[in-house]
């Protein structure tokens, strides 16, 4: 039985995973979690010890994939507002999380990630994680600059001058942009990295 007969689950922080390419539909595969056939499967990052090739959207949405493989779809240390803490001997001492635990679990265990050139980074705004909109270049954002919460600060955070965006930021290029939107105020945020 193929699972994609039912509607795809909704993901609060990644609402259009088919459009962003987080899920692929080019073949029918067996989900490594539920062992059901599916023609919609996850192709983004999944951090775990086991070798996991295919996950269906439903096993991501209900958290069963993260639970079964003790994995995550987003690295805790690569989320704005979440930091690793270390003791005096530089040993890992835990996570400093400024968000409610359930909110962090929703993002890390039940939200499909996205592909970055280096390490994906999830942005936040208004006390909540932002929605991932997609991959962008300068041409995708140049007419929307007034919609950003603070584009200059976003650029500084990923290591580029705001004045260099027009010549550097290219969708699929060496400097790739990742567009996010605040769930509460609707302002845009930008992350980027380099190949």
From Swiss-Prot:
One of its GO terms (biological process) is bacteriocin immunity. Transmembrane segments: none annotated. Pfam families: UPF0167. Coiled coil: none annotated. InterPro entries: UPF0167 (IPR005363), UPF0167_CbrC (IPR054918). Induction: Induced by the two-component regulatory system CreC/CreB. Disruption of this gene leads to hypersensibility to nitrofurazone. Belongs to the UPF0167 family. This is UPF0167 protein CbrC. It comes from Escherichia coli (strain K12). The gene is cbrC.
